Each structure stands twice: as structure tokens, then as C-alpha cells.
């Protein structure tokens, strides 16, 4: 019976070590999520600068067209989508860690229940104290993981809302860019017609 108790204590320590590893992995996921949030925020700030460029003089529009802003906007849109997908994958991974922790805790409780059934033949007080200590720490770690999961869920929801706003802004900027290009084209055509009109009378005068 003492071997069974020692085995349960050993299993409990092993489960606790696995729990700590899962906790470290969860913290790493949270750090990665925070880094993604910073990258998305930086891209949104970069996108906010674009409207100022569209408000410059018409003479600058021609120079801006060399950089193909609609392509840049499309690239930023794709990058934001990738960041959103990566963030969701991190959140799913965190939930998988949480499920694993709950499974570990369930197995641990089952082992302790088996011990309690057989405790009549042995003084199980030392084991019960060890169980209480390990159980409290495991419950604390699970609570932390649950809190991390809740934070990441809220972050994903906020990112979804911000992403919709960014998409709307990008569509607006693309429309403005199209209109500016049309104005530039009309202006260029008018200038060309004016030059041709001035050249024609001059040619007739020379004759």
C-alpha cells in the first residue's frame, strides 16, 4: 500500500511539472499575442498617415502614382489579415493548453479518490496534506490560464472590430486615389489639347 501512496505522490509531482510547462507555454502565447497587437497598431498608424498625402497639391499626385498606393494598401490589408489569423491560432493553442490542464486535474482527482477509498488500511494524512498543497497550486495555475484565455478572446474581438474599420478606411482611400487619378488624367488631356490649339495657329501664321 505504501508503494501505491508513493506512486500517487510521484504522479502528482509529475502532473505539477507538466502544469508548470503548460503555464510557461501559455505566457509565451500571451507575449506573442501582445507583439501582434503592437504590429497591428503600428500598421494602423501607418495607414492613418496616408490621408494627409492625398490632401497635398495636385502636382504631387503624379509623383505619388509612381509608388502605386493602391498596391501598398492591398499589401497592408493582406498583412493585417495574416496577423489576425496568427492571433486566432495563438488563441486556439491557448485553449488547447487549457483543455490539457483540465484533463490533468481530472486524472489527479481520480487518483486521489482511489487513495481515499483505500485509506482505511493506511494513515493517509501525509498524502492528503500533499494533495491539498498540489491541488491548490494546480487550481491557481488553471485560473491563470483561464484569465489569459479570456484576455485573448477580448483581444481577438477588438482586433476584429479594428480590422473592419481599417478595411473601410482602405476602401475609402482606394476610391479617393481612383478619383484623383481621373482628375489628373482629365487635367493632362486638357493641357495637351491646349498645346495643340496654340501650335495650330502658330503654324498657319508662319505659312
UniProtKB/Swiss-Prot annotation:
One of its GO terms (biological process) is negative regulation of hippo signaling. The keyword DNA repair does not apply. GO terms for cellular component: cytoplasm; FAR/SIN/STRIPAK complex. Its main location: cytoplasm. It holds the Pfam family SIKE. The keyword Cytoplasm applies. Keywords: Coiled coil, Cytoplasm. Residues 70-102, 164-192 form a coiled coil. One of its GO terms (molecular function) is protein kinase binding. It is found in: Cytoplasm. Belongs to the SIKE family. Physiological suppressor of IKK-epsilon and TBK1 that plays an inhibitory role in virus- and TLR3-triggered IRF3. Inhibits TLR3-mediated activation of interferon-stimulated response elements (ISRE) and the IFN-beta promoter. May act by disrupting the interactions of IKBKE or TBK1 with TICAM1/TRIF, IRF3 and RIGI. Does not inhibit NF-kappa-B activation pathways. Associates with the striatin-interacting phosphatase and kinase (STRIPAK) core complex, forming the extended (SIKE1:SLMAP)STRIPAK complex. Interacts with IKBKE and TBK1 via its coiled coil region. Interaction with TBK1 is disrupted upon viral infection or TLR3 stimulation. Interacts with CDC42BPB. Interacts with SIKE1 which mediates association with the STRIPAK core complex composed of PP2A catalytic and scaffolding subunits, the striatins (PP2A regulatory subunits), the striatin-associated proteins MOB4, STRIP1 and STRIP2, PDCD10 and members of the STE20 kinases, such as STK24 and STK26. This is Suppressor of IKBKE 1. It comes from Mus musculus (Mouse).
